Amino acid sequence: MRPTHAQPPLLRVNVLLFLLLTCAAGVWAQSKPIEPCEPAAAPTPAAPKCPDKAATRASKTLIDDNIPADPEVEKLLAPYSSKVHELSVVIGTLSGQLKRSLVGSGSMGNFVADALKSQATKKNKSIVVAITNGGGMRKISIEPGPLHTSDIFELLPFENALITVDLTGAQLLKLLENVTRAHDAQSGARIQFRWNAQDRPEFIRAKLIDSAGHESEIDPAGTYTIVTIDYLYKLNSGNYALLRDGKNMTPLNLTLRDAVIDHVKSETAAGRPIRAQTDDRFQQIGPGPSRPIEIR
């Protein structure tokens, strides 16, 4: 008879072998790549069912003065109707064509800048120069004849407010140089310029000019008050960045458009027509540009 103590080692071997095979199977299962499941096909939408026949009915109604007014609609339009009526009011008579052109924005620029200076000076007597940008004038020309409020709204559609700024004479000269280069408008100075080889206006010199036409030198160390629009002041870049270097910026609580309208009404009340000024506030020295230049 075999001794009974030899059986346990054989049993342990079998158990260990079973455990090893089980672990190997688990490792093989983990290393096997998982096949992706095929997505289920989307159901085909059912075709919409349309009726075999469709019936439509149309009617025609003539809209003319025989249709009674709707009180609710009239109430809704009333505030706007009064504004439209204001736009159609004749505020003056234009004696010649106003037109934008190159340097200084032409007679249109002179008209706007002169009106700006005229009305702003009523609020601040120390103003010597008015400046505004030609790009803010949205009409190329206005023909002679009755001048309506709507003409000014079309010309100046933006809510640009007037401000005054104190500049040194050196800053003012630099500003007038930038005005010349940008084809913008000014009132209160006489500027000499030439056309350079790139067909761009090049500033030479400038002097102040009063309402009687008398010239005076600009002292680089002096202090001068100008009026312009808040849009140019807020730009803080390009031709008008130096406005931020000025002192005592003061709002005048008046928009450019209202200043022009008030100027026209004031001239009309005084019995004077609105003239298209083409004076020598911009004096060209030498020949003009070598090619046609588009006005934008």
Functional labels for PLM-detected ranges:
Residues 25-29:
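Sec/Tat signal peptide C-region and signal peptidase I cleavage site
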Residues 31-69, 106, 110-296:
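Feature captures C-terminal
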Residues 2-16:
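Bacterial N-terminal signal peptides that target proteins for export
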